[in-house]
């Protein structure tokens, strides 16, 4: 889990757009965040396995 201070710092409006970055809305992780769903790869996997994301299922071929 991310520190609350880092999450609050990220939410503030940055002076330069290049300084803004995405964080997972579920756990606060700053890396490997999927822009479409707003969650990191770990949370995405958990939500997909639980069936919480419609239309997403494990690939099998």
Curated annotation (Swiss-Prot):
Binds 1 zinc ion per subunit. Its cofactor is Zn(2+). It holds the Pfam family Ribosomal_S14. Zn(2+) binds at residues 24, 27, 40, 43. InterPro entries: Ribosomal_uS14, Ribosomal_uS14_bact, Ribosomal_uS14_CS, Ribosomal_uS14_sf. One of its GO terms (biological process) is translation. Part of the 30S ribosomal subunit. Contacts proteins S3 and S10. Belongs to the universal ribosomal protein uS14 family. Zinc-binding uS14 subfamily. This is Small ribosomal subunit protein uS14. It comes from Ureaplasma parvum serovar 3 (strain ATCC 700970).
């Amino acid at each position: 889990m991310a520190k609350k201070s880092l999450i609050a710092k990220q939410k503030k409006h940055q002076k330069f757009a290049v300084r803004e970055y995405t964080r997972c809305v579920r756990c606060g992780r700053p890396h490997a965040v999927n822009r479409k769903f707003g969650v990191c790869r770990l949370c995405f996997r958990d939500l997909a396995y639980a069936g919480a994301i419609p239309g997403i299922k494990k690939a099998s071929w």
